[in-house]
Amino acid sequence: MSDVWQQQRQRMVDEQLRPRGIHDQRILAAMANVPRHLFVPEALQAQAYSDQALPLTLGQTISQPYIVALMAQELLLNPHEQLLEIGAGSGYAAAVFAELVRKVVTIERHQALAQQTQVRLRNLGYVNIEVVWGDGSLGYPTAAPYHAISIPAATPQLAQTLLSQLHDGGRLVAPIGDAQDQQLIRLQRQGQNWQKTTISNVRFVPLIGAGGWEHAPETTAEGE
């Protein structure tokens, strides 16, 4: 059966990612290697390599493969770097990032989900991922600074506390906008200045916490 899953991953890379502009060979290799079917509910495993977000528990989702690959590519990642992910979900994106950087810190606000994800990642052999339980909307200063920050959840603005946790030269990718429609952007720190790049129009689940929304607004989303 492992060969079947591997074939599905390779088909995902060849049919969903390459044609849509994912060209970084390290990212394509990571996407072909990480077993997405082990990060979704068992009842949805047959859909694991389809081009769609899938539901998890507690109202969370796992991002569609293209979005994970796109965010990884836009973060301009290097092997020696440390990355912060806000919103661990099932740990799929963290696993992809872990194949691209030295260390991943991923923070999840749902304690039960954080615990499940920690066990899953440990069982899959990911030793360079730290799963933290807490409000990630303000980042995680304990392990800062970071070379890259990934926020796979929509927020109306970015907290200065979060931005200050980036290294000089560091990059942050996040969907910014209202609860229904956002723009995926990259901010790159240049001293006290920021270079902004708009990537695409997107629709993600909301970022809940002190640095995002206090309560979840109604939305339909493609993000994790």
Curated annotation (Swiss-Prot):
Pfam families: PCMT. It is found in: Cytoplasm. Belongs to the methyltransferase superfamily. L-isoaspartyl/D-aspartyl protein methyltransferase family. Keywords: Cytoplasm, Methyltransferase, S-adenosyl-L-methionine, Transferase. GO terms for molecular function: protein-L-isoaspartate (D-aspartate) O-methyltransferase activity. The keyword Lipoprotein does not apply. It comes from the Bacteria. Its EC number is 2.1.1.77. It is an enzyme of class 2 (transferase). One of its GO terms (biological process) is protein repair. One of its GO terms (cellular component) is cytoplasm. Catalyzes the methyl esterification of L-isoaspartyl residues in peptides and proteins that result from spontaneous decomposition of normal L-aspartyl and L-asparaginyl residues. It plays a role in the repair and/or degradation of damaged proteins. The active site is at 63. PROSITE patterns: PCMT. It catalyses: [protein]-L-isoaspartate + S-adenosyl-L-methionine = [protein]-L-isoaspartate alpha-methyl ester + S-adenosyl-L-homocysteine. This is Protein-L-isoaspartate O-methyltransferase.
